[in-house]
Amino acid sequence: EKTFLTVSGQLEGEIYAMALSEVYTFGPTFRAENSNTSRHLAEFWMVEPEMAFYDLDDNMDLAEKFIQYLVSQVMENCADDMAFFNQRIDTTLLETLRNIVDNQFERLTYTEAIHQLQKSTKVFNYPVEWGFALQAEHERYLSEEVFKKPIIVFNYPEQIKSFYMKLNECGETVRAMDVLLPNLGEIIGGSQREENYEVLIKRMQDKELNPEEYSWYLDLRKFGSAP
């Protein structure tokens, strides 16, 4: 029997969320990516919360509070280390961390982000066009040069996102969000889940997935569900 390295515990986490309302997983994650960059890892540990009856706004609120809590704890409990890094590695580190903790994250739709990029005079290596994923240079431009603080981009085109993400009424976007930090880029990705059984099956078929292979997941929607 074939076995695979896990990329996420999310789908399984949804099972427990149906019973316990608020749960999280913390475990190893493997990605078939080139890890010879400052932004990619082939293996890392990831926290994945799953909450029943959370909409996209609730997800964005949780993501913002989570990042701010973690950064504040690092600044409080690892002050000497942060001071060392600020002195020897990046003299703007402490300023960047305070900016994360002290400011409300900017929120804008994917469409608004595309408009911001298209009206910019900056020349990007990758073209800016609605329907394509934002590249690292786009994300950093928005967080570092336009807003100069953490941002949350939401309502992405459905064709570039996963089948389980809640489809908006327009039918063109899904209730997904990414948290982008200055000097780093994307640090959190999340979404409101699609709770409609028929819509979920169609989304699977549109992405050429076999619903029978996800029968256990579809049962969560067939016999009562929550977003």
Please place each PLM-identified region on the residue numbering.
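A translation/RNA-centric and nucleic-acid-associated enzymatic feature enriched
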Residues: 2-69, 83-227
